[in-house]
Amino acid sequence: LPIPEDDHDAYRRNQAQKAQWTRGHHGVVNVTLRPLKYSWEYIDGVKRPIRASRQEKGVDVLCALALVDLARSGRYDVVVLASRDTDLAPALDNAARTTRTKIEAVKWFDPADRRTRGNISTQAKIWTTSMTRDHFTASLDPRTYP
């Protein structure tokens, strides 16, 4: 999530999208927005974010925690992780090993891109569904957030 001081329009659009996705789905859909990490500079004595420095941080940790928490809650038969991030393998293994919940994964697959082949390497046998460019296109949010 860009900070308002850096990109007010993007900040506003992210907030509008979050509101749309959660509207009418209380307790079912949870959207967590994390502020991007910035380097800062002082211009004329005023601290300003450097846009080119912004980075997404901590999202993989949030995904890992959510996966394990949802699996351990006992409220779900299946928990599906949608990611290609290999850093999440320990969370997949932990959830599969310590709960009765079935753990699955979903990843994007492009036959023309060798980097998208294979699955996240885990000790547990995790069912992984490969989604194509058509699936990706169909999953896009068609709304324009003003």
Regions found by a protein language model. Give the residues of each.
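Active-site histidine-anchored catalytic micro-motif
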Residues: 58-62, 70-119
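A charged nuclease-like catalytic/ligand-binding cleft shared by nucleic-acid processing domains
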Residues: 1-75, 115-146
